[in-house]
Amino acid sequence: QSAIKYIRDTFQKEFGKEMNLERISAPLFVEKSSGLNDNLNGVERPVQFDIAGIKDEAVEVVQSLAKWKRMALKEYGFQPGEGLYTNMNAIRRDEELDNLHSCYVDQWDWERVITKEERNEETLKDTVRAIFKVIKHMEHEVWYKYPQAVKILPDQVTFITSQELEDRYPGKTPKERENLITKEYRSEEH
């Protein structure tokens, strides 16, 4: 638990600095009529309840912050190149439970303002490289403090499209293709 807290706290600080993001608190619930709750796939039912001080209005536990983050960027006056990061706590009552999924969600999230001209593949790749730079730095910090918790990452990120993966491994499932390409580029647990 202490390693998880260390990674989370340090990553948020380093990532926020690298990406020019400010920490903003996210709501636990929103008024149903606000339209800010994301219905995900359209079939998940949000947890809903009433609050004594809010007459004739139900509130819903947030399921996703997608709409809220964009509203917050505008409301707080963020400019291109600036953004926010936040933490979402949610209950997803229709989640299919397994080793990776729970009905309780504790999710870290971020959003940044970009210009129309920046909506392109190169901006996406530059953003991924910046994120990877922080992750690589974190790998070293974590190794120094918790050597047993580290996975060895490659020195640089590799980009490949779904089509390129399918062409390279035509008889494999998408998950098998992912596993094969990560082994090839050494992004695996050691």
Residue map of PLM features:
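Residues that form generic nucleotide/phosphate-binding pockets
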Residues: 14, 127, 168
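Short, flexible, solvent-exposed loop/turn segments with mixed acidic/basic and small polar residues
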Residues: 98-103, 178-180
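Class II aminoacyl-tRNA synthetase-like tRNA-binding/catalytic domains
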Residues: 1-101, 109-113
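Intrinsic disorder/low-complexity segments enriched in polar/small residues
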Residues: 32, 189-190
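Long, highly charged amphipathic alpha-helices
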Residues: 6, 10, 126-137
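Metal-assisted phosphate- and nucleotidyl-transfer catalytic regions
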Residues: 130-189
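Well-ordered alpha/beta subsegment
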Residues: 115-117, 121-125
